[in-house]
Amino acid sequence: MGSTVGAAYEERWTAPPWVWAAAVVVALVAAATLHSGADGARAVVPYAVLLPVALLTVLRASRGRVRVVDGVLQVPGGRIALDHLGGVRELDREATRRVRGPLAQPRAFVSTRAWLGEAVQVQVEDPDDDTPYWLIGTRAPAALADVLRSRGR
């Protein structure tokens, strides 16, 4: 949770160390493949380009946050008034995998990151919205679900 005044819930999606390490390894392998046979300054170019791109990509993905503020659920890519939400379900890793994969509905709104294994599924009860549910990645499904069930109060 964060320190935002008026926020009933706040969670940052900071990438864990293994994501940073994986990004560096992928960038190094790709750069090594591209620089094969190059000499001099041309051998350095793939590393100088791919390493910063990989790190900036992870940094950008880590900027996501879930917030419940002033009766509104805010996630990367969307926001919805809590009044339009119905049932709330906490999902463990296996349930999250199923809802993101074989049981996914095409119209569902999904906001998560690869390193967030758990999630909260929230039914949408807005008559003007054909989205059946929101799937929100979180490290603390119980805490987020409790806030959503209490409608952010």
Residue ranges of each PLM-predicted region?
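Hydrophobic, well-ordered secondary-structure segments
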Residues: 5, 25-28, 48, 121-125, ...
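Short, aromatic-rich membrane-interface segments at the entry and exit
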Residues: 38-47
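Conserved beta-hairpin
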Residues: 50-89
